[in-house]
């Protein structure tokens, strides 16, 4: 609409310009009239204008009428020019006002675009933050599920360990019952008495053989012939064979007893270690050790102490228990050096 008003108002300005040109033409005609008047005055002074005066007067009248008309047109043109000038000034003011409005609208548009960009960037940032929050929530949910699974597995493992510990504690309690310990002590005592009897029998046999050998040898020593005959006799062979059998049986019995004793000691040590470990685990898990188990711990100074055989006369207490079967065999060798395995081998070679 502003463009249309500007074009509609530009047309009268063009007409005003044409009228201004006409007014300029009238100014030139008035100047010509003045020139003619001067010329007439000059001719009148000279006195050669009589035949042309009327013509000149007519022309002057015409020129004056034209001048009046031109003045009238000039006044109209001036009024029109003033009106157009006022209209032009108003148009200029409207143009300035419209430019101000346009600049304001452009500034508003720029601000709105900036706000729109800020809103878009804020929306994009919020969208990215929402995506990050969703991803973080999903990761936290996964961690929670993993932690729940770990706790469940730990709880199941703890329950299994607790059941195992309770079973082991029950087994230990059954193993350390007074009735069972009494039976074990009785069995060890009986085996000890049997071993002592067999040891006494072997010692008696060895003493008999030693006395027989001493009686055969004599104080000064027998002759080689009698010694050779005796060594080649059936009695010597039977004696050697009997002695070898008794010695082998004694070694087997001693080895079996020592092995049984060692097994019992190892078993007792294992049970004690297991019991101590179970006790530590129970204390670690915050459970109290039963009072009966604590009383049995004081009673069980060690199955090896209970099951250890009594020392023989003239021996230090616990020496037989610490020495084992090898020392007993060595004692037999030291008691009867002549009847050692080397002596048996020499007797066999002589036969």
Curated annotation (Swiss-Prot):
Major component of the transverse central element of synaptonemal complexes (SCS), formed between homologous chromosomes during meiotic prophase. Requires SYCP1 in order to be incorporated into the central element. May have a role in the synaptonemal complex assembly, stabilization and recombination. Homodimer. Found in a complex with SYCP1 and SYCE2. Interacts with SYCP1, SYCE2 and SYCE3. Interacts with SIX6OS1. It is found in: Nucleus; Chromosome. It is linked to Premature ovarian failure 12: An ovarian disorder defined as the cessation of ovarian function under the age of 40 years. It is characterized by oligomenorrhea or amenorrhea, in the presence of elevated levels of serum gonadotropins and low estradiol. Residues 1-31, 267-351 are annotated as: Disordered. GO terms for cellular component: central element; chromosome; synaptonemal complex. One of its GO terms (biological process) is cell division. The gene is SYCE1. Belongs to the SYCE family. It holds the Pfam family SYCE1. Residues 1-10 have a biased composition (Polar residues). Residues 52-290 form a coiled coil. Keywords: Cell cycle, Cell division, Chromosome, Coiled coil, Meiosis, Nucleus, Premature ovarian failure. Its main location: nucleus. It comes from Homo sapiens (Human). This is Synaptonemal complex central element protein 1.
